[in-house]
Each structure stands twice: as structure tokens, then as C-alpha cells.
Amino acid sequence: MKGFVRNSRRGPAHSWWVALGLVVLLTACTVEESDGPVGSDDVVEPAPSGHGDWQVPGLVDRSGAPIEVPAPGPTTGRTLDVTDFGADPDPNSHDDAPAIRAALDAAKPGDEVVLPAGTYDLRSTDPADESANIVLRSGVNLRGEGQERTVLLTSLDGEDDSRVIRGSGVHDVIVADFTITSRHKGPLGDATGGPMYGIYLGANEGQASSRVLVKNLGIRRFERHGISVKASREVTLSGNYISEATAVGPGGQGYGIAIEGSADQHDPDATNDSRHNLVIGNTFDGRHLRHAILLQFPTHNNLVAENTIVGSLLDAIDLHGEGEYLNEIRDNTVIGGQQAGIALGNPGGSKNKHDASGRGNWVHSNDLIGNRQGVLVILGTPDTLIEDNWINAGEDSKAGIEVRNAPGTELHGNYITGGTDGFWAIRLSEDRGTDGRGTGIPSGIRIEYNVIRQAANGIRIDAGEDFSVVENVIDGAELRVADGIEVSHIR
């Protein structure tokens, strides 16, 4: 796997993360846009559809060779101004949705529809889809004049499956440079209201949406997902700012970004196989988000990178315990979450029961500051590689890395510091499962070359079998192994 050079921030830091979080929130709208497609240094074009599953995590083809995820090209045709079709950019004007839809209908592939600065009132839904204000078309871009200058204000308010913008089976589309919000005036996180989804991208008759770029959007006052990408591939979400969910209860409420496969489908040959999506350089105010970034169902070989999350009510980056596999989670900053910064496996679910995430996910080079756990792996999630993360515990932190029933997990080269009494840099414990699923003990765990400095406590092994604890540096802390547990190598 490709190596990573960490920055030089090392040593005790027990209180500065609060100030950093405030800075992040104040500067969130200045996130630098990605210069282009993101991949590994040496890239090849995606391999044609073949047979067999992937074996290597991240942005690779079936053979394991790095790929560059294709992105839609720039506008090559006309620019259509929605005000020429009757849209009024003044706030509290008439319904502007028909004019926007008319401009999209008039556009041809290669054209773009532009929303000049102003506020556009969306009071009606598409005649062919009563769930959506606006329906995207393949090859036609939709662009505002800036996240703070162009606003789409929807009147959708709690209707089932309601979406401000929907794209089903679309390709080669850019959606950029505006804010989506709603007229919801109630409390945040405690009620329901606004649209279910800000942006919804999905398949159409089994054909995935692909080559879609969603960038520099502000999305707030939604109920379920700010951006939802379902059964699609080659979708890039970059430079967006997401906050203020109106509900954060169970059943899928209050997710910032959700990348989903199809429930009960694990078929890499399917035309709607979920893979090769990028979630990069987005910012989340997690005070009213259940999860900031969520991967769900058998979605694989996605990249979640360089995102900043300040606070979240549950696990900030969550692989949701429904077979998500071979995803790469790197270079993210997660600050002050009430639960784990990054979690693999989930005990929830009503319609779809959650337990283990899939095999071979790669969690590396993240900065995890002041969360309850830095990384949590549970409920039978197998073969996770956790390496080169920088974890700084806060007063309420319980563990830097916590591993329960997670066979084959490797912890390598992580740097862990901070914490108060009761905090352990690395902790292995029995998994009691969820409704009888996922019970077990840690097994086949490798804890190697980690650095634990000025932490309240070092490594604690309460349960498990077949461990290797090798060449770790524990500064002023300790290694505690419960009676009756054998560790094959300790040095």
C-alpha cells in the first residue's frame, strides 16, 4: 500500500482542539476546491467490466491497479440563464421551480443552466416526479454564482422521499456553487421537517448514476441526508458544507453524506454496483448531525479523504455494519465527536439489521481529536487495517482505538496521546453483540509499532486470543493483559 508522510504535530495537546473546532466552523465556507480527479499517483483508465470481486482497498480496478475516477467535463455548449425563463432571484417571490425546470428542459448535453445570485423559491415539484423540485438531465450542468450568493429555498416539508434535486441514472453532470435550504422553522435535530434529501443521486432501472460532480454546495435544514448517493459510481462530492439536520433519530435521519449500495446485493458485475465514489474536502458542522459521513450496504472501493468534521452525535464517519468493504478512509480531521471518530460495524437498524462491516477497509493518516473513541471496530468486522493515525484524546475520551469482535484487525504505526483517568490508548474487549448478532472476542489482532506518549494509560487486553503485540513505544503508561489471556508475542 502507498505510504504516507505524517506532519510534525506531535506531543501533548489536551485543550487546543476546542479552539481548532471554532476556527474550522468559522472558515468552513473557504474550503479549497479539488483541482481535479483524485486517485493515486500512477493512474490508469478504469478496467472494463469483468468478473470476480476486488481484493485491494481504495481507488483500484479489479487487478489492484490504481485508477483515476473520471469526472464530467466542462461546459462545451450554451449557458442558459434561469431568469430568461422567468425565474425571479428576489426572495419570497413567485414559484421559481417551473422556470428552472424549463431551462433544464431546453438544455442539450454540453450546456449549463446558471442560477444568478439571489434566492429561488421552490414551491412546486416536477410534473413527472412529485417527490422532487428539480430533476437533473445527463450532460447538463447546474451552477450557481457561489455558495453564499445563490440559494435554493424549498417548501418541501416532511413529505416521504422528498428531494430538492434528484438524478436517477444520470451521467456527466456538474452541480455546483449554491446553497440548498428549506423553510423549516422548528428546532434542529429534535423534530422533523424540510426535505428528506437535499441532493439524491441513484440508479434508474438498474443503471447507476456515474461521472457526477457535486461541489461547493451548502446544504442545511433537511431531515434524512444532505447528499445521498445510492447504487451509483464515479460520483465526486467535494468542497461542500453540510449542517443543521432537522431530525437525528433512528431509521436514517440526520446523515450529512450517505454512500449506499443496494440492500442484500453483493454483485460487483451489476450495473448498479456501488463503488469508486469520492467524498473529499467537505466540511461538516456535526452539532445537529447523527453521522457526518456514512457508508452503507455492500459499497466498496470508495475514498473518504480530507474532510473536516466538528462534533457529531454518533460516530462521525460510520461504516454502517451492512457489508461495506475495501474502502479507504484517510486524511480526515474529526474533532469532538460524542461517539467514535471513525467506526466500522454498527448495532442499530430496524428494517435492515446492522452488525459487521465488510472486509479489508483501510483507515489511515487521520487526525482524530477529542472523540469518545478515535477508531472503533466491532460486531465481527474482519481484516481492517488501521495505521498511521494521530489520535489525541480529550477529557471525555474512553479509548484511542477500541477493538471488540473484529478478527484480523491490524493496528500499525498509530500515534496516540492524551486522555484522563479511565482512558486507554488501545483497548481490546469482549463484544456483547446486538440482538444476538456479532458476539465474540478479539482474535488474530496485530498491534505493532504504535507510539503511545503522555497518554493516561497504554494497552489493555480484556479478552481475546491469538495476539501479537510487537515493538510498540509506551511512554509512561502500561500494558495490561487480563488473567488467562495468552499473547503470542510481546516485546
Residue map of PLM features:
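Extracellular beta-strand solenoid repeats
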Residues: V114, D121, V135, N141-R143, ...
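Short glycine/acidic-rich loop motifs that flank beta-strands on beta-rich extracellular proteins
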Residues: D111, S124-T125, Q147, L153-R163, ...
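Bacterial signal peptide processing site
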Residues: T30-E33
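Acidic, glycine- and Ser/Thr-rich low-complexity intrinsically disordered tracts
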Residues: A47-A65, V69, T75, V82, ...
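C-terminal motif of bacterial Sec signal peptides marking the signal peptidase cleavage site
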Residues: L26-A28
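Extracellular beta-strand-rich solenoid/capping regions of secreted or surface-exposed proteins
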Residues: I100-P109, D121-R143, V151-A176, T181-S210, ...
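Acidic Gly/Asp/Thr-rich repetitive segments characteristic of extracellular carbohydrate-active
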Residues: V82-P116
